[in-house]
Amino acid sequence: LTLWDSRIIMEYLDERFPHPPLMPVYPVARGESRLYMQRIEKDWYSLMNTIQSGTAAQADAARKQLREELLAIAPVFTQKPYFLSDEFSLVDCYLAPLLWRLPVLGVELVGAGAKELKGYMTRVFERDSFLASLTEAEREMRLGRG
């Protein structure tokens, strides 16, 4: 079996190793999770790609837009500890790599919503499973400084 799309790989792994499940049990909630992941990819990962490969002006505009959009959703993290959920899910797994790279991308979280978003990031980044998933290069992005 050869899989190549990150979401397909993540769902396959969740089904292959189902304990604990990272996708909701109920079909409607599963569909919502898939929509959230699609939106994260379409809206935010595309901005990350522009920051990394666009012109300086395009990167600056994408950096600003990404910061504003992330801060705009921050209130959801006052209602539930994870992305619209009481439980850590595949949506959190999908969003975490982007959030981990924010300092390298030059995206600084300041202003309204920053505290809530940083609290969410801390909850995700302190999970043993997240830390175990980091490559050496990813670890250096945040942990290897100093």
Annotate each PLM feature:
Residues 1-75, 81:
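GST-like domain detector, emphasizing the conserved glutathione-binding G-site
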Residues 14-18, 41, 78, 103-107, ...:
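Hydrophobic/aromatic-lined pockets within catalytic cores
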Residues 17, 113-116, 139:
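Extended, non-catalytic scaffold segments that flank or surround catalytic motifs
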Residues 43, 83-108, 112-113, 118-124, ...:
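GST superfamily/GST-like fold recognition
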